[in-house]
């Protein structure tokens, strides 16, 4: 997922995406704790994707406030 695709989404879609990423991040951390996680890079990717979504949400909020 890249920032260009995220900017095309609505605020509600971004919030849904953020909720999904948080769930995914939780599941990945849980798998790591139980020793079932094979691809540890997924944790970093999920965290960065969540940060991208939050950044776009903040940009949209700032644009709406102006």
From Swiss-Prot:
HAMAP family on file: Ribosomal_uL29
Record Gene3D superfamilies: 1.10.287.310
Full protein name: Large ribosomal subunit protein uL29
GO BP, sorted A to Z: translation
Keyword check for Ribonucleoprotein: yes
GO cellular component, one term: cytosolic large ribosomal subunit
InterPro entries noted in UniProt: Ribosomal_protein_uL29, Ribosomal_uL29, Ribosomal_uL29_sf
Keyword annotations from UniProtKB, A to Z: Ribonucleoprotein, Ribosomal protein
Lineage: Bacteria, Pseudomonadati, Pseudomonadota, Alphaproteobacteria, Rhodobacterales
Molecular function terms from GO: structural constituent of ribosome
Family the entry assigns: Belongs to the universal ribosomal protein uL29 family.
Keyword Iron-sulfur: no
One Pfam family it belongs to: Ribosomal_L29
């Amino acid at each position: 997922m890249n920032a260009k695709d995220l900017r095309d989404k609505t605020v509600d879609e971004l919030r849904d995406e953020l909720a999904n990423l948080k769930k995914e991040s939780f599941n990945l951390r849980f798998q790591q704790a139980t020793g079932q996680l094979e691809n540890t890079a997924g944790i970093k990717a999920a965290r960065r994707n969540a940060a991208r979504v939050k950044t776009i949400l903040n940009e949209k909020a700032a644009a709406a406030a102006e």
